[in-house]
Regions:
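Phosphate/NTP-binding elements of NTP-utilizing enzymes
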Residues: 1-187
């Protein structure tokens, strides 16, 4: 759990200074910390409870349950209101039904039946609102807020205000994007 990522980062950075393998943590200059972990089983996501993160990266996202990702991103936050917090999901197409949630999250880019499919470019930001089990996508935060205001039971923060709309984008990757893999039998 996490060992391969530590090895890969060591290759990228040129050394493993600051890496603590047993804890799967990499202490970087200026007090920064990279923590590697996993969620092999349902319930494993709970070990990340209460640990604020300004970036969460998930490799092989379709191998996770949607509920695990939704739980972990509850801790995607910063005490600094100017700090950008980000979630990055990297994955191949789903190989099981449990991974199909990823297609819903990125439907405007990957689902030909979605009304926005073909009109949004890779990397273009859309704002989304989760209404029940359905993601609704909008071209601006104002459109997303307007939608929330019209919902019968809109989501509310603890102070009663509407949450700030969140953005999402999708960038397709191909084998040709990685020359190191082209030279192998990966594809």
């Amino acid at each position: 759990e996490g060992d391969g990522l530590g090895d890969d980062c060591g290759k990228i950075l040129g050394d493993r200074d600051g890496y603590r393998g047993q804890k799967h943590r990499w202490y970087l200059p200026e007090g920064r910390l990279v923590q590697f972990g996993g969620c092999q089983h349902s319930g494993d996501e709970k070990k990340y409870k209460g640990q604020a993160k300004d970036f969460i990266g998930v490799d092989e996202a379709t191998e996770f349950l949607e509920s695990q990702i939704l739980y972990v991103i509850n801790w995607l936050r910063s005490a600094d209101p100017n700090q950008l917090v980000q979630l990055m999901l990297a994955t191949n197409p789903p190989s099981t039904a449990e991974g199909e949630w990823v297609a819903r999250w990125f439907a405007p880019w990957v689902d030909p039946s979605h009304p926005l499919f073909g009109s949004v470019k890779p990397g273009e930001l859309l704002w989304f609102v989760l209404d029940g089990d359905t993601y609704h996508f909008f071209r601006s935060p104002a459109e997303a807020t307007e939608y929330m205001e019209g919902m019968p039971s809109p989501p509310r923060l603890h102070d009663g205000s509407l949450p700030k709309p969140q953005s999402r984008t999708f960038i397709r990757s191909e084998l040709a994007d990685n020359p190191d893999y082209i030279r192998t039998d990966y594809g």
